[in-house]
């Protein structure tokens, strides 16, 4: 099972945080970009503030535009083979993340359900949430912890999110710290955004941040609008989780129960989808859904509003766009809207040191090679992750790709139709020259997107919750103020807010 801060998703490792100053240096090789730096965060902050005005980072020079070479045949197929969940076992014990990913990547076909295992089948809706969290792996961060130490804790534990508590002796939580907050903080230090909170304390923290002084993670976690921190007791079921997460909420806390608000785990969209996959053979009622193409579920419709970033645009532009739109990843496309790759908010870790400042002015296309190289160095993976699906990809295979790539969303592409090859004088097709080519030649033209919210929303509607709205949480975040970051909410309050939202539409 993946580490989900006790259910918070696993993230790649990276050196300690140091907000970089923009540099005029040309992009280095991916290996050089990942070299360690001795520059401290305090020393770097002051440099980051200087010369970082937005006007300096609007568009890259043509010499910076370098699309990484496409992977060879076989490298791009790591997730194409992902089709079948792990085999049925009577035990509900948790499997390791590495074993699960390997199983997902190597399963060649989606096998039929075996009625000899009927005694092990169960309704997915009835599984309790305490089966899905690991209290012994839960890691907190105190609100007064300096942000750089909180970032180190994210890295050390391979998490993408940490619950924030007011004091070590407290186990109740009202909000979290994640890579989206880190991105907002980097942009704040560099002067691209301002804090919504204008209280004297907040303004003092902004001043400290821009002068290179430590600021508490509690302040950084409040820089952007978030979902109210929903708390659900441990004896609640997976049906409740799908209702919450299928409405667009990214994660919620699992607590001891009505008599105690002590948090025992954080359940995210990614962990929930992984759990569905790992136990898929036990949920026989999901077999028809797993086999259904995305287009039949309404998940692959052409969407002209998919958020993208041009391959020739700066990395800093991608970070700003993800922050402004409150999304966790962007599709990188060429001038013809062909999919080149994917940039995630977690990739902000690769520009968190002063030695990496040149990457802020690198093109997004070049940055894709840096991301790929980091994946290879950290995980030993020499393959290009497949972040795309087609309208005919099945629901089950889409889930499998999300599990294999740890992606929050997959891009829907219209595959390229190969043109007929001219024949040689002998009547045989001409041999194909194998050389570097753009990723678009393999990925196809971008037409839409499928997110974890979409996957869980379909699951909820499949279970009979026809009113489940995948856009509820996004609307709620847009209406929220910075004070909502620290608000707690019970499941009952969540249901009431949904009813109010329906009445306003």
Curated annotation (Swiss-Prot):
The keyword Nucleus applies. Residues 15-40, 481-490 have a biased composition (Low complexity). It comes from Yarrowia lipolytica (strain CLIB 122 / E 150) (Yeast). Residues 1-70, 85-104, 414-441, 464-505 are annotated as: Disordered. Involved in DNA replication and cell separation. This is Protein SDS23. Residues 493-505 have a biased composition (Basic and acidic residues). CDD domains: CBS_pair_SF. It comes from the Eukaryota. It is found in: Cytoplasm; Nucleus. The lineage of its organism: Eukaryota, Fungi, Dikarya, Ascomycota, Saccharomycotina.
């Amino acid at each position: 099972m993946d580490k989900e801060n006790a259910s918070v998703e696993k993230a790649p490792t990276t050196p300690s945080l140091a907000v970089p100053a923009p540099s005029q240096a040309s992009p280095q090789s991916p290996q050089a970009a990942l070299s360690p730096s001795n520059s401290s965060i305090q020393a770097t902050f002051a440099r980051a503030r200087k010369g970082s005005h937005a006007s300096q980072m609007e568009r890259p020079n043509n010499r910076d535009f370098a699309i990484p070479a496409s992977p060879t045949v076989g490298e791009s197929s790591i997730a194409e083979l992902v089709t079948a969940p792990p085999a049925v076992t009577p035990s509900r014990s948790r499997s390791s993340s590495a074993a699960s990913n390997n199983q997902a990547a190597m399963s060649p076909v989606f096998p039929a359900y075996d009625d000899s295992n009927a005694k092990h089948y169960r309704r997915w809706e009835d599984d309790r949430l305490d089966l899905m969290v690991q209290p012994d792996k839960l890691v907190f961060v105190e609100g007064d912890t300096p942000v750089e130490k909180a970032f180190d804790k994210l890295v050390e534990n391979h998490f993408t999110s940490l619950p924030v508590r007011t004091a070590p002796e407290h186990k109740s939580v009202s909000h979290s710290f994640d890579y989206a907050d880190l991105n907002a903080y980097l942009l704040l230090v560099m002067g691209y955004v301002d804090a919504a909170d204008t209280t004297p304390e907040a303004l003092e923290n902004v001043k400290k941040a821009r002068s290179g002084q430590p600021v508490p993670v509690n302040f950084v976690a409040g820089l952007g609008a978030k979902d109210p921190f929903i708390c659900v007791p441990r004896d609640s079921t997976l049906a409740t989780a799908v209702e919450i997460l299928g409405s667009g909420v990214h994660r919620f806390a699992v607590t001891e129960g009505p008599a105690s608000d002590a948090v025992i785990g954080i359940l995210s969209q990614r962990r929930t989808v992984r759990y569905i996959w790992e136990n898929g053979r036990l949920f026989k009622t999901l077999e028809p859904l797993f086999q259904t193409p995305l287009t039949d579920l309404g998940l692959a419709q052409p969407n002209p509003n998919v958020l993208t970033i041009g391959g020739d645009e700066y990395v800093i532009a991608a970070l700003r766009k993800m922050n402004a739109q409150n999304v966790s990843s962007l599709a990188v496309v060429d001038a013809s809207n062909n999919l080149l790759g994917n940039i995630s908010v977690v990739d902000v870790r690769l520009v968190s040191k002063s030695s990496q400042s040149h990457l802020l002015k690198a093109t997004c296309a070049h940055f894709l090679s840096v991301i790929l190289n980091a994946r290879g160095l950290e995980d030993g993976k020499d393959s290009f992750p497949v972040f795309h699906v087609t309208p005919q990809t099945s629901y089950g295979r889409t889930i499998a790709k999300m599990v294999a790539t740890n992606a929050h969303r997959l891009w829907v592409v219209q595959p390229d139709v190969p043109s007929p090859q001219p024949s040689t004088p002998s009547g045989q097709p001409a041999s194909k020259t194998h050389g570097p080519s753009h990723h678009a030649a393999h990925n196809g033209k971008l037409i839409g997107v499928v997110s974890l919210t979409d996957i869980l929303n379909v699951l909820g509607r499949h279970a009979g919750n026809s009113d489940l709205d995948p856009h509820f949480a996004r609307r709620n975040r847009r209406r929220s103020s910075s004070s909502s970051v620290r608000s707690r909410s019970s499941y009952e309050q969540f249901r009431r807010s949904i009813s109010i939202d329906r009445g306003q539409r």
